[in-house]
A protein has these predicted regions:
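Noncatalytic alpha-helical scaffold of FAD-dependent oxidoreductases
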Residues: 2-546
């Protein structure tokens, strides 16, 4: 809690979220429940893609008719099953259609595969045996972690064998001096973070799906998340990887060294490769010390220019203690209040066009409180912000974060949502949202009684990552044609990237040319051909079809 002197300086300006104003905080907000296999069947059918039953929902192959099953891949045979049964326990093999349903479908119920077999190895050696056999016998494979992806990268397109890392969930070692953690790829991110918390450390990434996503999947998709501003991307925090190549070769590079200047840094090839070059089975990652002093403030501002001004000043005045700088617009918080907050509570006294959530973390509370106080006072004096609250305990800390983390779930409550994850230069960040609203409005598709209820923008100002969501009643070809490929053309025109942290999968692979040159795509194809000449690893994704 802020000291009495600090609190006195802030009274009448930024409100401390203490006992007197506790009712103003969204204490009744329902923190989004992490997805799990057990919860899959009860997750709202309206979420994201479809209100249809699984039997009526179209297969991914039908939704992407340009994709054709490769004739070079074999169909699964009894001989193949006999081999898998010879190396795996019966509980690690699933052929039951009902059991496979949760693994053939993504959690958004947008992508639906047709796999007849799921394998759940528990060791790297078993993964090696499986991939060698599949490569020798031309059986396509889809690696799957927690299945929390958003672009269809972790589910089959046709009848590929699903190789789940769920049984590979052991922590192998932790060095309390260096902070180097070595673990299996199937470890759940939140489990790792809780383990490190007991040691005084923290995972360098944090995601809304942390209760279900696997660290191997995080690495394979180069997941970003809420801590990237402070700790950087996985390209910097991953120290080493254990990867099984398509031919079964085990690439043992689980180094815990901070510095190793011998040869090519091969692990970087697999970070963000989405399971197309091999399967990550082990991860060595550098975990930073957990901060002893953490503050969270939610601020209301009147324009995106003021959001930028607040961010610039935070880099100048909060610098080394700044750990997150998130923004969301009024449409975002309105959806959260409508769908996730009991009693329509608002953390601030009135609505604002934009909101900023700032987190600081450090080792000296008095020092951090003083810096944050000076920063907030300056914003108020210069009329950069109009209102705000500062969390005073762990519950309020979580409640303020729950607003930001609840936006994706709230967007889905209208029936479905179109999701775009873009890297855009901050000065034109919000122009994308405004242009898309104008485009849909001109087409007569935007409004409570129209196809699209609202367009919302939120994301990570600190790394230029915009989450552009369209909350709609249902999927519509008319809406899709208005959004695509315009959203990618706009991004390319402003020197952005069509995928900031969600990856490419089956959804964005046809649009890769908006972010990468022909020569770069050709080099990617050559790398793919070199490491996976038979093309068995996660086919039909990542790279555009020729």
């Amino acid at each position: 809690m802020f000291s009495m002197a600090t609190a006195a300086r802030l009274q009448g300006h930024i409100r401390l979220a203490g006992a007197r104003s506790l009712q103003r905080l969204p204490s009744a907000i329902k923190t989004p429940t992490p997805l799990s296999r057990a919860a899959f069947a009860t997750f709202p059918k309206a979420a994201y893609a479809s209100t249809a039953s699984a039997e009526k929902r179209p297969f991914t192959a039908d939704k992407f008719p340009h994709l054709k099953r490769s004739e070079s891949f074999k169909k699964l045979s009894d001989k193949d099953l006999d081999f898998f049964k010879s190396i795996l326990a019966p509980s690690a093999i699933s052929q039951d259609e009902g059991d496979l349903e949760a693994f053939n479908n993504d959690w958004m119920q947008k992508y639906r595969g047709q796999s007849k077999l799921m394998l759940k190895p528990s060791t790297t050696e078993q993964v090696s045996q499986i991939l060698k056999y599949c490569n020798d016998n031309m059986l396509a494979v889809v690696p799957q972690g927690g299945n929390t992806g958003l672009v269809g990268g972790g589910v089959p397109v046709f009848d590929e064998i699903i190789l789940s890392t769920a049984n590979m969930n052991s922590i192998r070692s932790f060095d309390a001096l260096s902070g180097a953690l070595v673990c299996d790829a199937g470890c759940i991110l939140e489990v790792l973070d809780n383990y490190l918390a007991e040691q005084g450390y923290i995972m360098p990434l944090d995601l809304g799906a942390k209760g279900s996503c696997h660290i191997g999947g995080n690495v394979a998709t180069n997941a970003g998340g809420l801590r990237l501003l402070r700790y950087g991307s996985l390209h910097g925090t991953v120290l080493g990887l254990e990867v099984v190549l398509p031919d079964g070769t085990i690439l043992d590079n689980l180094s815990t060294l901070r510095k190793d200047n011998t040869g090519y840094d091969l692990k970087q090839l697999f970070i963000g490769s989405e399971g197309t070059l091999g399967i990550v089975t082990g991860v060595s990652i550098l975990s930073p010390k957990r901060s002893k002093a953490v503050n969270v403030a939610l601020l209301g501002v009147s324009s995106f220019e003021q959001v930028q001004a607040a961010y610039k000043r935070s880099r100048d005045e909060l610098s080394e203690i700044l750990s997150a700088f998130e923004f969301f617009d009024q449409a975002s918080i309105d959806l959260v209040k409508q769908h996730l907050v009991a009693g329509n509570n608002d953390p601030l006294e009135s609505s604002h066009p934009f909101y900023v959530l700032i987190e600081t973390s450090g080792s000296n509370k008095d020092h951090d409180d003083e810096k944050l106080t000076n920063y907030l006072e300056g914003l108020l004096t210069d009329e950069i912000v109009q209102d705000g609250v500062v969390a005073q305990d762990t519950t309020q800390f979580k409640n303020l974060w729950a607003i930001r983390e609840g936006i994706p779930e709230a967007c889905s409550k209208s029936g479905t949502v179109y999701k775009y994850d873009l890297s855009i230069p901050v000065p034109v960040f919000y122009q994308m949202v405004e242009d898309m609203r104008a485009r849909l409005d001109k087409a007569g598709l935007l409004g409570k009684d129209k196809e699209v209820d609202c367009v919302v923008g939120f994301g990570h100002i600190g790394d230029g990552n915009l989450h552009l969501n369209f909350a709609a009643k249902r999927y519509s070809e008319a809406v899709t044609n208005i959004i695509e490929p315009y959203v990618y053309e706009w991004t390319a025109k402003h020197a952005g990237s069509i995928s900031s942290e969600h990856g490419l999968g089956v959804f964005k692979s046809p649009y890769l040319h908006y972010s990468k040159s022909p020569s770069m795509i050709q080099l990617m194809r050559r790398i793919k051909t070199m490491l996976d000449p038979n093309g068995i690893m996660n086919p039909y994704k990542y790279l555009p079809e020729k």
